[in-house]
UniProtKB/Swiss-Prot annotation:
The modification 4-hydroxyproline is found at P2, P11, P29. It is found in: Secreted. Pfam families: Toxin_19. Belongs to the conotoxin I1 superfamily. GO terms for cellular component: extracellular region. Its main location: secreted. Iota-conotoxins bind to voltage-gated sodium channels (Nav) and act as agonists by shifting the voltage-dependence of activation to more hyperpolarized levels. Produces excitatory symptoms when injected intracranially into mice and is lethal at higher doses. Exposure to frog cutaneous pectoris induces spontaneous and repetitive action potentials. This effect is slowly reversible. Natural peptide (with D-Phe) is active on nerve, but not on muscle. Synthetic peptide (with L-Phe) is not active on both nerve and muscle. It comes from the Eukaryota. Coiled coil: none annotated. The natural D-Phe form of the peptide is more potent than the synthetic L-Phe form. It comes from Conus radiatus. This is Iota-conotoxin-like r11b. Keywords: D-amino acid, Disulfide bond, Hydroxylation, Ion channel impairing toxin, Neurotoxin, Secreted, Toxin, Voltage-gated sodium channel impairing toxin.
Length: 46
């Protein structure tokens, strides 16, 4: 099954949300196509 975000329990496929899916706790922006599993910088969506 899909991995889930530690912060809100949503599937990591919801890149629009600031999910703590990475071990480093970095958020995953939906625009990240090179590294879909992790962002290279913090990304917050209000």
């Amino acid at each position: 099954g899909p991995s889930f975000c530690k912060a809100n329990g949503k599937p990591c496929s919801y890149h629009a949300d600031c999910c703590n899916c990475c071990l480093s706790g970095i958020c995953k922006p939906s625009t990240n196509v090179i590294l879909p599993g992790c962002s290279t910088s913090s990304f917050f969506r209000i």
